Amino acid sequence: MTRSTNLSHTSALILGTIGAGYRYGFDIMAATGLPSGTVYPALRRLERDGLIKSEWEQDKDAHAAQRPARKNYTLSRSGRTTLDGAIERYPLLRQLVLAARD
């Protein structure tokens, strides 16, 4: 059984959102409408499973913007493959991802 078969709707939606260019937790919450108590644990699981990567923003950039440093999320190669499989499995996800890319 492939990872995309085991991917929850929430995880698929978050992967699709990251794949569409939303990079930070707050942006992902805003784009999906999911609460932080759903998004952040899912991000940790996706990173643990190797589907996404994260990197902290440079302190100087955050300081210049007068806010705390943010964690930037990107799809891994495995995450891209899994997202493509999820898009085939969840037709609505395809519509959401395509709409977000426009």
Residue spans for each PLM region:
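N-terminal helix-turn-helix DNA-binding core of bacterial DNA-binding proteins
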Residues: 2-40
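Short, charged/polar surface micro-motifs in flexible loops or helix N-caps
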Residues: 20-24, 48-49, 79-81
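Amphipathic alpha-helical dimerization/coiled-coil segments
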Residues: 78-102
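Basic amphipathic alpha-helical segments that dock to polyanions
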Residues: 39-51
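A positively charged, amphipathic N-terminal helix/segment that binds anionic biomolecules
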Residues: 1, 73
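Exposed loop/turn and edge beta-strand positions of beta-sandwich/beta-sheet ligand-binding modules
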Residues: 69
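Residue-level recognition of specific faces of alpha-helices
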Residues: 14-17, 42, 72, 89
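Beta-hairpin "wing" of winged helix-turn-helix
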Residues: 49-66, 74
